[in-house]
Design a protein with these regions (language model features):
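Glycine-rich, charged/polar anion/phosphate-binding loops
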Residues: 10-12, 105, 136-137
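Glycine-rich, aromatic-flanked loop segments that form ligand/cofactor-binding clefts
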Residues: 90-130
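Metal-dependent enolase-superfamily TIM-barrel catalytic cores that perform enediolate-based chemistry
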Residues: 116-169
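Metal- or metallocofactor-binding catalytic centers and their adjacent structured scaffolds
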Residues: 28-101
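Structured loop/turn residues at beta-strand edges in well-structured enzyme cores
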Residues: 4, 87, 115, 145
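Residues at beta-strand starts and edge strands
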Residues: 21-23, 53, 117
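A generic structural signal for short
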Residues: 13, 81-83, 126-127, 133
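Structured beta-strand/loop patches that form or line metal/cofactor-binding pockets in enzymes
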Residues: 2-36, 40-41
Length: 169
């Protein structure tokens, strides 16, 4: 209901592979409704766990709308972990609202706009052989499985401080 308050914020970190952890943030309200949001940001799990604890302290006992207030107040933040956790809190709040109102979230956000959406295969994590041939084999496997859009990140060993020509900036 609109008068329910936040009673718990808890992160769950799931080890999916040696390269991947998924992070979910759960928000529970005083009327027992549980909402879930996703905050995956590899390598930042402990920072996100700490932020979830901090935000639980800040938001516990407050109405769900306090999450929107937090998002607006921190919208200029460049802290990736903070942005990921706040995004997950917003997702969880929409999940809760949908459950409380008995409506799907997409309806709360304005309704169906498209009946079909394109999907892609992210072949980055599955590609153990990081050579060109390895990426090609992964790409072919995805195409053979019916995908016509692919996502990869073949940038192992490159860092943001390296310029386009390979020189340090």
């Amino acid at each position: 209901t609109m008068t329910s308050t936040i009673t718990r914020i808890a992160p769950t970190i799931i080890r999916v592979s040696d390269k991947t952890n998924w992070t979910f943030i759960e928000v529970k309200t005083s009327d027992g409704v549980l909402g879930v949001g996703e905050a995956t940001l590899y390598g930042q799990e402990e920072a996100m766990r700490a932020l979830a604890g901090k935000f639980e302290g800040d938001l516990k006992g407050k109405p769900l709308s306090a999450i929107e207030d937090l998002a607006e107040a921190t919208s200029a933040s460049t802290d990736q972990a903070q942005r990921a956790v706040i995004s997950a809190l917003e997702q969880a709040s929409w999940d809760i609202r949908g459950k409380q109102e008995g409506k799907p979230v997409h309806e709360l956000l304005g309704g169906t706009k498209n009946t079909q959406i394109p999907i892609y295969a992210n072949i980055n994590r599955r590609t153990v052989d990081r050579s060109l041939a390895g990426f090609e084999a992964s790409g072919r496997a995805a195409v053979d499985a019916g995908f016509n859009l692919l996502k990869i990140a073949p940038f192992d060993g490159l860092h943001p401080d390296i310029g386009r020509d390979g020189d340090a900036l």
